[in-house]
Regions:
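Active-site glycine/GP-rich loop and adjacent strand/helix microenvironment
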Residues: 1-52, 60-67, 75-78, 82, ...
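Short strand->helix junction
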Residues: 114-117, 423-424
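Conserved AMP-binding loop of ANL adenylate-forming enzymes
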Residues: 129-178
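Short glycine-rich loop/turn motifs that provide flexible caps or phosphate-binding loops at active sites
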Residues: 99, 148-149, 214, 275
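Active-site diphosphate/adenylate-binding microenvironment
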Residues: 27, 31-95, 106-111, 118, ...
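Non-catalytic, beta-rich accessory domains that mediate macromolecular interactions or localization
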Residues: 84-85, 101-115, 238, 245, ...
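Gly/lys/ser-thr-rich phosphate-binding loops in alpha/beta enzymes
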Residues: 101, 106-111, 122-143, 381-393
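Ser/Thr-glycine-rich phosphate-binding loops at phosphate-binding pockets of nucleotides
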Residues: 95-104, 277-279, 351
Length: 503
């Protein structure tokens, strides 16, 4: 019996347990809240907010405010200096470095031992459990996993404490048995210089029997392309004939799908989306025919949701899981065993089902364009680009968009800077298709575009090859979990990129 067959039997009880998500979702979530509040009683934060007096969800909402990173920053800084029992019991040794706030270059998200095992690793195990359930003929464990991670560094002078990309923290603490199935070597996986790392990963893994790959689509694509260059082959299956699945997350896969399908032409290749972030592991695509993800309810994560239109209100409506509506955009609020209490994570989601609870990621609360009342979100952008690519034979590698508030002719428009891996047959047609489709799916954008009065036709600027990587490198953010900001009301990133595009 092969290793995968043995593993499938090991995962069978969990596969059955996950069926509870269909039967008692609200009950599961309220058990999670009870557990988190009980643990929180042992902390300074819990004493300040009278956790001992919390007996139900209503008490919880009265005693605990909605928090952004700024509200928790001082407590997190104290934890980084070794203080214990601040937001979560005990000493927190690991901090996941995430993209920054208005006031800081980076956020440092605490990762407790409980969070590591009861959120992040549990999520990783469930991805495998659901994949094996859907693919009984899999030979996943008969080869190696290529896990693309970031890097880490010591945290102040706290012994054994680390700061870095979440992926690096996960690799550093991985179960020794799981480590036997992973490539590349840990020293390579945790290198900080992405260009060096990409080359070494390609060289180390080229002759391995890789059956599955995990990572952010943009960075993984870069590694695969480098491996093709070194091997002299055209398609991945010529190097890894047993590759069967890409577990991806971090950014939308849509703009990269065609490039992966061109590179990996095996009919047996699968793609499975996960929603794992520095703050936690939240969703898994449980059905390959449905792009929506199953909300994972029995981890150490309690969920709440704010209607997107109220996210900046002084007293927004906040609902638990049972209060969500299908088809509505929500900002997600989480409470976790990493000491994040009613934390506004910054992502926006839309539920497609409540039996079970399934959702799609629609964007970021800070990544949108609403300069003229058009309310363009990332979900609109991704769908518009996918349509324009389909109509013109293009493939998008990276992009960003920002408003032009008023040019020399007193005209306003959206400006899109796009790096193509496959240029469109006709750039003007690409822009027309994008503009047309955005009007089809966003009535606010359509209204502002009406008769070119408020908004002119969007502008597409072609980025030179490597522009976005050069920009990220200039900012010390090449590789790992760093992402190009897609949409912004500010022109700061756009102006920097346009200037760099001339060099």
């Amino acid at each position: 019996m092969g290793l995968t067959k043995i593993a499938s039997k090991v995962f069978l009880p969990r596969q059955k347990e996950l069926e509870r998500h269909y039967i008692n979702p609200e009950k599961i979530q309220h058990h999670v809240l009870k557990h988190l509040v009980e643990k929180g009683c042992e902390t300074e934060y819990g004493r300040t907010h009278i956790f001992s007096g919390i007996n139900n969800y209503s008490d919880f909402t009265k005693n605990v405010p909605i928090n952004t990173y700024e509200e928790l920053k001082n407590d997190i800084d104290r934890m980084r200096h070794g203080e214990q029992d601040v937001l979560w019991p005990g000493l927190i040794k690991w901090f996941a470095k995430s993209s920054g706030t208005t006031n800081d270059k980076s956020k440092f998200i605490p990762v407790s031992n409980a969070g590591l095992h009861r959120i992040h690793y549990k999520g990783g195990a469930d991805v495998v459990a659901l994949y094996l359930r859907n693919n009984p003929q899999s030979r996943l464990f008969d080869g190696k996993s290529l896990i693309l991670g970031g890097s880490h560094s010591p945290n102040y002078n706290v012994e054994g404490s680390l700061v870095g990309d979440l992926s690096a923290i996960l690799i550093e603490n991985i179960n020794p048995i799981a480590n036997l199935f992973r490539v590349p070597k840990k020293q390579t996986a945790l290198l900080s210089d992405f260009e060096t790392k990409r080359d070494r990963i390609a060289r180390e893994c080229m002759n391995a029997n890789v059956t599955n790959i995990s990572g952010v689509p943009s960075w993984m694509l870069s590694v695969l392309v480098r491996m093709m260059e070194l091997s002299g082959k055209k398609h991945i299956e010529e190097v890894w004939p047993n590759l069967e699945v890409f577990f991806h997350g971090g950014i939308a896969f849509g703009p990269y799908r065609k490039q992966y399908e061109d590179l990996i032409q095996s009919p047996n290749m699968h793609y499975m989306e996960t929603y794992n972030a520095s703050e936690g592991f939240f969703g898994i695509q449980d059905n390959p025919d449905d792009p929506a993800m199953l909300l994972m309810l029995d981890y150490d994560v309690f969920y709440e949701f704010i209607p997107l239109e109220e996210v900046n209100a002084e007293s927004p409506t906040v609902v638990p899981l049972e209060g969500v509506e299908i088809g509505r955009n929500y900002a997600m609020v989480i409470t976790t065993s990493c000491g994040l209490w009613r934390y506004l994570i910054g992502d926006t989601v839309m539920f497609t089902s409540t039996k079970p609870y399934k959702f799609v990621i629609t964007g970021r609360t800070k990544y949108f364009i609403n300069a003229f009342g058009e309310e363009l979100i990332m979900d609109n952008a991704e769908k518009g680009l996918a349509y324009a690519c389909k109509e013109t034979g293009a493939q998008v590698l990276e992009y960003t968009a920002a408003p032009v508030y008023m040019d020399e002719n007193a005209k306003c428009r959206h400006q899109w800077l796009i790096e193509f891996s496959q240029e469109p047959d006709d750039l003007k047609k690409f822009g027309d298709c994008l503009d047309h489709y955005l009007q089809q799916i966003n009535s606010d954008y359509e209204a502002k575009r009406s008769h070119d009065i408020t908004l002119q036709h969007l502008e597409v600027v072609k980025a030179r090859e490597g522009l976005f990587n050069d920009w990220l490198k200039m900012k010390g953010k090449l590789g790992g979990q760093h992402k190009v900001p897609r949409l912004s009301n500010s022109r700061k990133n756009m102006d920097e990129l346009l200037e760099l595009n001339q060099e």
